[in-house]
Regions:
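Generic detector of well-ordered alpha-helical segments enriched in charged/polar residues
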Residues: 14-17, 84, 91, 121, ...
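Extended, low-complexity amphipathic alpha-helical repeat segments
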Residues: 97-163
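Extended amphipathic alpha-helical heptad-repeat regions
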Residues: 64-82, 89, 93-96, 100, ...
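Leu/Val/Ala/Ile-rich N-terminal alpha-helices, chiefly Sec-type signal peptides and the beginnings
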Residues: 1-88
């Protein structure tokens, strides 16, 4: 997945934003920038959650071997695996949206160069992308809440073990 370059720094996005601003479509430029910022933020959040899930997995492996801990360890491992799978699923959705945003921007820019500024009205295609993105964003927040609950359980087990 192409996580090294943020969508807001993509050349084609910058070009589309410039075209929109030059054609007095500042509101549409702001909408496109907002969508790109959402995608960038979601990518960062998913990377952070993936790192934390990996850390959680490492901590689970280090837990002592006794029955109570083993039961908790098994439950936490299963929860961590479910969260990790869901995180990967959402990461894939965000990547698809990112590709769609770049493709739509490229099509609009290319068409504008070929046919003129009137084709910038196609920027309304980003509205559909925004709706999809907001749905993914909601999923990320649900996943993060679930992750936080599991981490609290993990911390409680750690305190019990220490006592």
């Amino acid at each position: 997945m192409e996580a090294e370059k943020t969508l807001t720094n993509e050349e084609i996005i910058r070009e589309l934003l410039d075209l929109l601003k030059k054609n007095t479509m500042k509101e549409q430029a702001n909408d496109v920038f907002e969508i790109c910022t959402y995608v960038d933020g979601l990518e960062k959040k998913i990377v952070s959650m993936t790192e934390e899930l990996t850390s959680m997995q490492d901590q689970i492996k280090k837990m002592q071997e006794d029955t109570l801990i083993n039961n908790a360890k098994k439950a936490l491992t299963e929860a961590q695996e479910r969260l990790n799978a869901r995180c990967e699923q959402i990461k894939s959705q965000v990547f698809e949206i990112k590709v769609q945003v770049k493709s739509t921007a490229k099509n609009i820019v290319d068409e504008t160069k070929a046919k003129g500024g009137a084709t910038l009205c196609r920027v309304t295609e980003f509205v559909g992308i925004k709706k999809r993105l907001l749905n993914v964003r909601t999923e990320v927040f649900r996943l993060y809440e679930n992750y936080c609950k599991k981490m609290m359980q993990h911390d409680i087990i750690g305190l019990t073990k220490a006592a």
